[in-house]
Amino acid sequence: MNRLKEKYQKEIVPSLTEKFNYSSVMAVPKLEKIVVNMGVGDAVQNAKALDKAVEELTEITGQKPIITKAKKSIAGFKLREGMPIGAKVTLRGERMYEFLDKLISVSLPRVRDFRGISKKAFDGRGNYTLGVKEQLIFPEIDYDKVDKVRGMDVVIVTTASTDEEARELLSQMGMPFQK
């Protein structure tokens, strides 16, 4: 069983129940899924750019991403509806916990001059969004094989009803929020 999941069940659930006075164990907020999205704007002119992004996302998450397509045509971006413009992965269960564990303990500390992540990126419904500027912070990515620095969005979806509960859940899991 995953380290983070074990910690959640043994330590986090009791402490959250105590803090927010939940009536049952099922009311305690938990992680639902983590969505990792990589928008590849270059894919419009160069279809090969997307293949590389898909490959990198697969290495980072251990799961094959789906290719996202443009919903609308935008002439300013030379974009037609249905063109592939990105890739995303939805992680649940074991893989989700593994990814979060790796993100907290390995990847985030590797960010240049890292001082913690913003406390303000909650959406009001207990979900947290985090932007990663470069894919190099993940240990699976080999620096020499990278053709271009790409960023990505990581959305952590929890069952918490308020931001405060979600913040408490994530910080007990070890998310390095700014003091």
UniProtKB/Swiss-Prot annotation:
Pfam families: Ribosomal_L5, Ribosomal_L5_C
GO cellular component, one term: ribosome
Organism domain of life: Bacteria
A single BP term in Gene Ontology: translation
Keywords, ordered alphabetically: Ribonucleoprotein, Ribosomal protein, RNA-binding, rRNA-binding, tRNA-binding
Sample GO molecular function, one term: structural constituent of ribosome
Main function: This is one of the proteins that bind and probably mediate the attachment of the 5S RNA into the large ribosomal subunit, where it forms part of the central protuberance. In the 70S ribosome it contacts protein S13 of the 30S subunit (bridge B1b), connecting the 2 subunits; this bridge is implicated in subunit movement. Contacts the P site tRNA; the 5S rRNA and some of its associated proteins might help stabilize positioning of ribosome-bound tRNAs.
Protein family membership: Belongs to the universal ribosomal protein uL5 family.
Quaternary state and interactors: Part of the 50S ribosomal subunit; part of the 5S rRNA/L5/L18/L25 subcomplex. Contacts the 5S rRNA and the P site tRNA. Forms a bridge to the 30S subunit in the 70S ribosome.
Record-linked PANTHER family: 60S RIBOSOMAL PROTEIN L11-RELATED (PTHR11994)
Protein name: Large ribosomal subunit protein uL5
Gene: rplE
